[in-house]
Design a protein with these regions (language model features):
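PLP-dependent amino-acid enzyme catalytic core
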Residues: 1-139
């Protein structure tokens, strides 16, 4: 059986080399409303303003020997992958639906810089995912 505490500790140590921890903050209003201690994890204070960066980091570090990454996302995961491509200095292709808000596309490009290429395709995530599968089947 795996020692998940040790694995979590390893992941935390590795992630701290890339970005700082986000704080827990007690929410006075919700605590009073529900008569309980309500704390919020402030992922909005991470570099990409989302917890999705953690998933992108952990997935990509497992394959750090790869020279490129591909993903399909309509938003926050795309930004996490873009940020990590720049951090790891690896190339990435990010497929996003054509319906993705321009602000989300621009932020993704800013996070990834010259390390990423954004491809707008299809109206829905499933369309993007199918294009990713097709691209990867040719690799």
């Amino acid at each position: 059986m795996r020692n998940f505490t040790a694995l979590a500790d390893q992941a935390e140590k590795a992630i701290r080399e890339v970005f700082s921890p986000t704080p827990l903050q007690r929410n006075e209003y919700l605590s009073a409303l529900y008569g309980a201690e309500i704390w919020l994890k402030r992922e909005d204070l991470s570099p990409v303003r989302s917890y999705k960066l953690r998933g992108a980091f952990n997935a990509m570090r497992k394959f750090s020997d790869k020279k490129a990454f591909v993903c399909a996302s309509a938003g926050n995961h795309a930004q996490g992958v873009a940020f990590m491509c720049r951090q790891l200095q690896v190339n990435g292709i990010i497929f996003m639906p054509v319906t993705t808000p321009q602000q989300k596309i621009q932020k993704t490009q800013i996070f990834g810089g010259e390390f990423i290429e954004i491809r707008l395709t299809g109206d829905y995530f499933d369309d993007c995912f199918e294009d990713v599968r097709m691209l990867c089947s040719h690799c």
